[in-house]
């Protein structure tokens, strides 16, 4: 395939659509990006226009080819990674959506999830789908559309409607309505999919009253699904050959494809995934059991956990406390002091997630003495991100019995060397920061490239997945455990704060 020089990853996110062009050495050659409209019809409701998602995504595909000055016959394949759970229902004959896309953040189906709990379905859903009962996932969103859009249920019963997450919608549009598929990673986020049998679950379809005919075919994350002439000139057709939900794509982009390998994405919050191989582990700590890819893009399993407030705590220092001017300053101020002087910041602004699951916890600063200053508070705030990561990873290790080999990292806060070094120290494992920061797009590109022979196997990619810097842990175990014990004490005192206040 010497004439094929490039792979394109379509990265369809919550606020923008991007196209990333990569060469055979997995270097980013060019990026095109377009934002699209966020629609908030009521408090707690979030929608996107599916046609605008498609318009922005298809235009970035054409734009990235034009900007790079390449021809479409040089493109080996297109891979797709996407915002997960976001739900689209459209007419099979026309391709017209019957309603806006209901976004993963949307809370409109809380009454449906409350009824699922009241009717005693929680344990079945947990054991079958790996998920907690929450409006976050696609199943209740599909039900809402069928129940609330005039004529939708009747059309669905007649087999005239199709459902898909964003990946399914993009493949449908790219192939001009010829292919209706999803991959295992996205299917596992719908609350309609049995992650053990790897089939759509009849009982869940019955509980939510969703006809089977609406569902896409579920395929591996690395295979050729169809061809597209979008982005192709002169009749050239490009294979669409890789799909993974954004967090699973990032896991694959880090080449975490074996049990015990983990990645953490540091954004507003943190998304952590620990690969568990062929074991679907039901968490005792409120983590999600989800599907991830093995080396060949076939379905295996992972545990997923999230920290609500990570990078957002640095924004708080900047915007509310005004003790840093921008996020980049935090590293400088944190290193103006040699330690946190006993100060702990618990950034529980919206409660605490795994493993505490306390919506009544609130933010607090502990351990203040007369000598504490703003630099200590900045340092303690950065440290809180690392402590929370340890909390989740300890839950993961407890559930899985796997000892973390190393932690691969991505996201904005990974540029903070102080935070990354402290993360290594508090976890007692190496923290590896990659050269290529577009890890989610890399994952989609790898899956597409392997499916089409652009890359031979994962061993070839390992040479390209270069680590920019490894942060090795401090060997002082006594200091590490003393610090972490202080953090646990601080968290304990912030729990149920708002609940006690109400009483």
Curated annotation (Swiss-Prot):
Binding site for sn-glycerol 3-phosphate: 14, 84-85, 136, 246
Gene3D superfamilies, per the entry: 3.30.420.40
Superkingdom, taxonomy of origin: Bacteria
Record pathway: Polyol metabolism; glycerol degradation via glycerol kinase pathway; sn-glycerol 3-phosphate from glycerol: step 1/1
Single GO cellular component term: cytosol
Keyword field: ATP-binding, Glycerol metabolism, Kinase, Nucleotide-binding, Transferase
Pfam family, one: FGGY_C
Leader sequence segment: none
Keyword Ligase on entry: no
Regulation of its activity: Inhibited by fructose 1,6-bisphosphate (FBP).
SUPFAM superfamilies: Actin-like ATPase domain
EC number: 2.7.1.30
Binding site for ATP: 14-16, 268, 311, 315, 412
GO molecular function: ATP binding; glycerol kinase activity
GO BP field: glycerol catabolic process; glycerol metabolic process; glycerol-3-phosphate metabolic process
EC class name: transferase
Binding site for glycerol: 84-85, 136, 246-247
UniProt catalytic activity: glycerol + ATP = sn-glycerol 3-phosphate + ADP + H(+)
Family to which this protein belongs: Belongs to the FGGY kinase family.
PANTHER family on file: GLYCEROL KINASE, SUGAR KINASE
Job of this protein: Key enzyme in the regulation of glycerol uptake and metabolism. Catalyzes the phosphorylation of glycerol to yield sn-glycerol 3-phosphate.
Protein name listed in UniProt: Glycerol kinase
Organism listed in the record: Haemophilus influenzae (strain PittEE)
Organism ancestry: Bacteria, Pseudomonadati, Pseudomonadota, Gammaproteobacteria, Pasteurellales
């Amino acid at each position: 395939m010497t004439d094929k020089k490039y792979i394109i990853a379509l990265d369809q996110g919550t606020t923008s659509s991007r196209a990333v062009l990569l060469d055979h050495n997995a270097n980013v050659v060019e990026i095109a990006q377009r934002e699209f409209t966020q629609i908030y019809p009521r408090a707690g409701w979030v929608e996107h226009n599916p046609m605008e998602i498609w318009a922005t995504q298809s235009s970035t595909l054409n734009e990235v080819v034009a900007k790079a000055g390449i021809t479409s016959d040089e493109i080996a394949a297109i891979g797709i990674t996407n915002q997960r759970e976001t739900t689209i229902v459209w007419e099979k004959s026309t391709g017209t959506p019957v309603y806006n896309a209901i976004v993963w953040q949307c809370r409109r189906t809380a009454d449906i999830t409350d009824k699922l709990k009241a009717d005693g379905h929680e344990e079945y859903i947990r054991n079958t789908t790996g998920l907690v009962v929450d409006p976050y996932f696609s199943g209740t969103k599909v039900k809402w559309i069928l129940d609330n859009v005039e004529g939708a249920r009747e059309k669905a019963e007649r087999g005239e409607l199709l459902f898909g997450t964003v990946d399914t919608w993009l493949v449908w549009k790219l192939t001009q309505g010829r292919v209706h598929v999803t991959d295992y990673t996205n299917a596992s986020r719908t609350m309609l999919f049995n992650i053990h049998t790897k089939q759509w679950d009849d009982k869940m379809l019955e509980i939510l009253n969703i006809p089977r005919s609406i569902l896409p075919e579920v395929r591996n994350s690395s295979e050729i699904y169809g061809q597209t002439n979008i982005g192709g000139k002169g009749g050239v057709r490009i294979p669409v050959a890789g799909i993974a939900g954004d967090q699973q794509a990032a896991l694959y982009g880090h080449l975490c494809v074996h049990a015990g390998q983990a990645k953490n994405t540091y954004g507003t919050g943190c998304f952590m995934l620990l690969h568990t191989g062929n074991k679907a582990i039901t968490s005792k700590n409120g983590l999600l059991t989800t599907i991830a890819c093995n080396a060949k893009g076939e379905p295996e399993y992972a545990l997923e956990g999230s920290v609500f407030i990570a990078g957002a705590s640095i924004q708080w220092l900047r915007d509310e406390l005004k003790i840093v001017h921008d996020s980049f300053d935090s590293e400088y101020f944190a290193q103006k002091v040699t330690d946190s002087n006993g100060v702990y910041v618990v950034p529980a602004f919206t409660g605490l997630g795994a493993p505490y699951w306390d919506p009544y916890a609130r933010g607090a600063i502990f351990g203040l003495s007369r000598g504490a200053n703003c630099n200590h508070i900045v340092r303690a705030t950065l440290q809180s991100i690392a402590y929370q990561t340890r909390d989740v990873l300890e839950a993961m290790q407890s559930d899985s019995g796997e000892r973390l080999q190393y932690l691969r990292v991505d996201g904005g806060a990974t540029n903070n060397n102080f935070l990354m070094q402290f993360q290594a120290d508090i976890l007692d494992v190496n923290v590896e920061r990659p050269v290529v920061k577009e890890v989610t797009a890399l994952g989609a590109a790898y899956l597409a490239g392997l499916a089409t022979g652009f890359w031979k196997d994962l061993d070839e990619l390992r040479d390209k997945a270069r680590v920019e810097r490894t942060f090795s842990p401090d060997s002082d175990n006594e200091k590490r455990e003393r610090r972490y014990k202080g953090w646990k004490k601080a968290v304990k005192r912030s729990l149920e704060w708002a609940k006690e206040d109400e009483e």
